[in-house]
Each structure stands twice: as C-alpha cells, then as structure tokens.
C-alpha cells in the first residue's frame, strides 16, 4: 500500500523518538510517498531544532544522513490545490502539501500531528495508525 508520510514521521525515526518503533512496524512492507517539498521541510525542521538548542550542530548532519536512508517516492506538489486546503483550514502551506498529496493519490496519511489528523479526517483522508 502507498502511504503519505509527513515530515514529522521522518524526523521521529531519524532522532530515535518514542514513536520510531511503531512507525517502522506499521510502514514495513509499504511504499512511503511524500510531496517533493519533503527534503526542504526536513532541512528546515532540523535547523529550527538546532536554533532552539534541541539539536547540536553535528546532530543535524547525522539526522539528515539517517533520513536519506529511508526510501520515499517524492511526488509533484500541486501548490494551488494545497493553498486552497491551507486557506480553508487555516493551516501552514507545508502541512497542506501533505494533505493535498494524500487527497490527490487517495492514500492514507501517516502523521504524528494531531491537528493534521483532524483536518485529514474532515476532508475524508484515512489516517494510517
């Protein structure tokens, strides 16, 4: 099955967050898909964590290397459609890119973000749990 994976899923795995084991278990044997903005959002998230002193500088590079080992199919982002979702639900565009991808591909969404889960359910996207 194809699963749309949110940025926080990749970050959780790379940083050995408590959700890592469950994420690996429920995605094993499935194809991960994400919008083509994923690498940029991961880079932004890692440096934001560094700026907040949640990650050391050297941890940013090592987390990026771990993320690069996770197979993911990057798909074109329909920004216009995603902006419509962002405006309708008062979201950041980055969150809407993943919702648009899941909606467009009719695939379930895997995210740790409870707000995204709520919006996904509201627009008829299945949450992969």
Short names for language-model regions:
Residues 2, 35, 99-129:
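Acidic, PIN/NYN-like endoribonuclease modules and their adjacent C-terminal/linker elements
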Residues 12-14, 45, 119:
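Residues that scaffold the ATP/ADP-binding catalytic core of kinase and kinase-like folds
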Residues 54-55, 91, 125:
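Helix N-cap/coil-helix junction residues
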Residues 29-30, 70, 105, 123:
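Structured helix-beta-strand junction loops
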């Amino acid at each position: 099955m194809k699963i749309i994976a949110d940025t926080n899923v990749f970050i959780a795995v790379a940083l050995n967050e408590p959700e890592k084991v469950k994420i690996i278990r429920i995605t094993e044997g499935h194809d991960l898909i994400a919008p083509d903005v994923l690498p940029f959002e991961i880079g932004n998230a890692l440096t934001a964590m560094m700026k907040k002193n949640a990650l050391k500088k050297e941890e940013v590079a090592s987390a990026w290397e771990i993320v690069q080992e996770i197979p993911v199919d990057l798909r074109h982002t329909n920004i216009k459609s995603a902006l419509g979702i962002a405006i309708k639900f008062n979201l950041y565009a980055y969150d809407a890119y993943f919702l648009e991808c899941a909606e467009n591909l009719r695939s379930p969404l895997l995210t740790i973000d409870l707000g995204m889960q709520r919006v996904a359910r509201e627009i008829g996207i299945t949450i992969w749990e």
